[in-house]
Swiss-Prot record:
Task of the protein: Forms part of the ribosomal stalk which helps the ribosome interact with GTP-bound translation factors. Is thus essential for accurate translation.
PANTHER family assigned: 39S RIBOSOMAL PROTEIN L12 (PTHR45987), LARGE RIBOSOMAL SUBUNIT PROTEIN BL12M (PTHR45987:SF4)
Protein species of origin: Crocosphaera subtropica (strain ATCC 51142 / BH68) (Cyanothece sp. (strain ATCC 51142))
Similarity section: Belongs to the bacterial ribosomal protein bL12 family.
Quaternary organization: Homodimer. Part of the ribosomal stalk of the 50S ribosomal subunit. Forms a multimeric L10(L12)X complex, where L10 forms an elongated spine to which 2 to 4 L12 dimers bind in a sequential fashion. Binds GTP-bound translation factors.
Protein name as catalogued: Large ribosomal subunit protein bL12
Organism taxonomic ancestry: Bacteria, Bacillati, Cyanobacteriota, Cyanophyceae, Oscillatoriophycideae
Organism superkingdom: Bacteria
Region spans: Disordered: 98-118
Length: 133
């Protein structure tokens, strides 16, 4: 903002309610505008704003994309988990090994619910701790 607009803003902040009301009247007269709300019988709302109580009535949108996160890999289960990770991701041995050794690490991102649950099940069967977010 410029110094002039900053100065005006500071002066507006210091006005009393009566002074602000007088200012509105003067602006309406000087510029030929009206500060009155549109008379449509209904208030306009900003996009995304909800009427009070409406949020409770509307069901929350169901999440459609999930991330499967490899949280923990027990040392004795590392090879089995590595095989599952390679099968899921299609990564080479070195890349999959790096992924398994650097937990927590996302294994699959933006996948569907069923696919995410299937991946989680496979990894847990191999001995890994997995979360779906």
């Amino acid at each position: 903002m410029s110094a002039a607009t900053d100065e005006i803003l500071e002066k507006l902040k210091s006005l009393t309610l009566l002074e602000a009301s007088e200012l509105v009247k003067q602006i309406e007269e000087a510029f030929g505008v009206s500060a009155a709300a549109p008379s449509g019988g209904m208030m306009m709302m900003a996009p995304g704003a909800a009427a009070p109580g409406a949020a409770a009535a509307e069901p929350e949108e169901e999440k459609t994309e999930f991330d499967v996160i490899l949280e923990e890999v027990p040392g004795d289960k590392k090879i089995a988990i590595l095989k599952v990770v390679r099968g899921i991701t299609g990564l080479g041995l070195k890349e999959a090994k790096d992924m398994v050794e650097s937990t927590p690490k996302p294994i699959k991102e933006g996948t569907g619910k069923e696919d995410a649950e299937d991946i989680k099940k496979k990894l847990e069967e191999a001995g890994a701790k997995v979360s779906v977010k």
